[in-house]
Amino acid sequence: MKGVKFIRKDERATPRKVDGEAVGLLFRSKVMEGILVELEPVTGFEGTYRHNGEEMHLVLEGAVEFTVGGETFLCQEGDILWHDSDLEHRIHNPGMAPAAYLTILAPPAMR
C-alpha cells in the first residue's frame, strides 16, 4: 500500500559498525529516518556531530548520556530527548551494562 511501511524484525537491515557500535537503519522516508543504536558498556561515538534537522531519541535499554549544546542529559530506559540537530551533540554509554536507543531524524541524515 502506498504511504505505509511495515518491516518485520527479521527483515530489517543488518546493523553496521560505526565507531565499534552497532547502528541499524530501521526505515527511511522522504522526511525522516529511524535508527536503532546499540552501545557497549562505557563506549560512545568518537567526536561530535552537527547537521541540519531535528532528532528524537528514545532510550530502550540501559542509560545513555547525550551532550547537546554543551548540556549533558543522562537518559534512562523510557526517557525521550529531542533537540535541533544543528546543536553540537555527542552520545556516550556511561554505564557498565549495554544500552540501546531509537533515534528518529528529520530530514534523513544517514548515508
Please annotate each region the language model reported.
Residues Q76, S85-R111:
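Ligand-binding loop in jelly-roll beta-barrel domains
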Residues F27-E33, V42-L58, G69, E77:
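A short beta-loop-beta micro-motif enriched in histidine and acidic residues
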Residues G69-S85:
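Short acidic-glycine-tyrosine-enriched beta hairpin
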Residues F66:
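Short aromatic-centered micro-motifs
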Residues R16-K17, G24-F27, L36-V37, F45-H51, ...:
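Short histidine-centered beta-strand/loop micro-motifs
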Residues M1-E33:
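A short, N-terminal "cap"/entry segment at the start of jelly-roll beta-barrel domains
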Residues P41, N52, E71, L87, ...:
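A generic "binding-loop/recognition-motif" signal
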